[in-house]
């Protein structure tokens, strides 16, 4: 009888093991999603340094009629397909439509103008106003853009000696 039981136990074990070999796989799936939001950014700015402003003309012995120019660069990018990207430039010392550098006295101001591009031949930039900027597009790549600045003789002559400075804040915007 023990022998029959051993054979029966072996048969049951074999049957159980063979059942595993006949198992059926079960599957499930999951979805994967992502989205890209419309967005624009600016950064990586360089300083605009006019340096010493030429006040006197040694050749004529009078006041200089020369303008002073300087440039600054910044990076800007928008996600591909963002609608109507624009930039706004605001002077910390400006008022109305002007960009202004403030002197050490706290009351002396030198007005300057900003332009799109590397020279004052570009489109002038309105103070604190959103506007399109040449070369700035929503194509998903970073653009290195240049702004030119100009101080004309009338805005610097007669100003007291000292250091003048301003901070320009660039705001990137778009139509959602």
Language-model features, listed with the residues they occupy:
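Charged, amphipathic alpha-helical segments and their flanking helix caps
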Residues: 109-110
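Extracellular beta-sheet repeat scaffolds used for adhesion and glycan interaction
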Residues: 118-142
């Amino acid at each position: 009888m023990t022998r029959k039981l051993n054979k029966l136990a072996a048969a049951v074990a074999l049957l159980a093991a063979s059942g595993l070999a006949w198992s059926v796989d079960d599957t499930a799936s999951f979805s994967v999603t992502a989205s890209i939001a419309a967005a624009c950014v600016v950064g990586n700015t360089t300083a605009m340094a006019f340096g010493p402003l030429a006040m006197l003309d040694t050749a004529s012995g009078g006041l200089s009629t020369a303008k002073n120019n300087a440039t600054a660069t910044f990076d800007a990018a928008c996600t591909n397909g963002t609608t109507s990207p624009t930039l706004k430039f605001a002077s910390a010392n400006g008022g109305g439509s002007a960009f202004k550098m403030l002197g050490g006295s706290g009351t002396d101001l030198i007005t300057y103008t900003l332009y799109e591009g590397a020279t004052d031949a570009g489109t002038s930039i309105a103070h604190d106003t959103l506007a399109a900027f040449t070369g700035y597009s929503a194509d998903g790549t970073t653009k290195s853009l240049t702004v030119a600045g100009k101080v004309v003789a009338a805005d610097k002559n007669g100003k007291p000696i000292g250091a003048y400075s301003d901070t320009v804040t660039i705001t990137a915007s778009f139509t959602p």
